[in-house]
Amino acid sequence: MNELQMIRRASRADVPFLRDMLRHAYYWRWGTLDSIPGTRYVAGWGRPGDAGVIALDLGFPVGAAWYRLFRRDAPGYGFVDEETPELTIAVVPSRRGRGFGEQLLSALLDRARSEGYRDVSLSVERDSPALKLYERFGFRGVREEDDTVVMRAELANGRPS
């Protein structure tokens, strides 16, 4: 990243942008944000266990990565267990392929480590180009569901179980 590109922590003020990023993450399946079951990934943002980072280019947000803890009775798509936060990541189409996804993922995994998490999980389409990025960061498949793979990455120096 150059001096005009940066990563910063997400805040409650970023919820509208996180909702926009859900459109980019899920546009292929649902037509409008209100019909996206994924809105659970930002509803009530700021609760314990929520953390995220925003990529900026020339001062404008162009991508986001965040995680949230889910309960067994209300899981996310990549749910593994109640102690493992589930990650969501998206970059606006015009900025893809420029390293933002890698920078976002690196920053968010560093944050998860610093907060003491041992693992993070996610769900990805089997044919998604992002699958290779996740594998480079140590994510491994734990189960397959329809056309998706639930993946988990172990984080060094996380809190013990």
Go through the PLM ranges and name each one.
Residues L4-D20:
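A short beta-loop-alpha structural element at the N-terminal edge
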Residues R19-S35:
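Helix-loop element at the rim of GNAT/NAT acetyltransferase active sites that forms part
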Residues L56-I89:
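Conserved acyl-donor/pantetheine-binding loop and adjacent beta-alpha core of acyl/acetyltransferases
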Residues A112-E125:
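Conserved GNAT acetyl-CoA-binding A-motif
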Residues E86-G97, V124:
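A short, internal acetyl-CoA/4′-phosphopantetheine-binding micro-motif in the GNAT/acyltransferase core
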Residues E135-E145:
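Conserved acetyl-CoA-binding loop of GNAT-fold acetyltransferases
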Residues G97-S114, E135-R136:
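Conserved acetyl-CoA-binding loop-helix of GNAT-fold acetyltransferases
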Residues W30-L58:
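Active-site rim helix/loop that mediates acceptor-substrate recognition in acyltransferases
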